[in-house]
């Protein structure tokens, strides 16, 4: 995912500059046949786009690009209700009128996955739980909760193209994306097959374990131990030695 800062500095909302402490994120779809987020970023950079006081935080498109039009901690005007004071607003772009059904479905899937990735990043940044009630909501869900105006997005678009997407599924996908990112951030710990391969600090302690028969390795004669295993064994051996001394 690539986030391009394209702040709508001419927009009335941006110039108002009201602060926002994000407690959730609202998902929208733009409601018109335009797949380019850049087009929306440009059109929103005016005082009142289309004569309306409106501004969302970002637009997501199918290739993984996000155009950010407001700082995340600035109050947006994206839902016509009180959720403007609590939620970041993100719009997904929609297929162009000239696309085939298959092309449109591909575009929708692309924007969906871009949105999932963005929401996962924002949830991590602001320590939000995507599974918690009310944290991630669609515009239509916001209306049913009484915190947004009467819109049917984004699920109307998904149903129109029979995508099988739902907001419940979206929340699950965001949670999974966060979990996957956490797993990828944990580096693989190196393993050592012999004392000679180990860090200097570990060699004497491991050799004592081998001499005492506490560490023998596998059938190939390889120790195959990680650094955390080495530390644990050495600490345990020291505790045993201290008990013997007392």
PLM features per residue range, with description:
Residues 185-246:
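Short, solvent-exposed alpha-helical surface patches in non-cytosolic proteins
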Residues 32, 92-97:
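Short connector loops/turns at beta-strand edges and beta->alpha or beta->beta junctions
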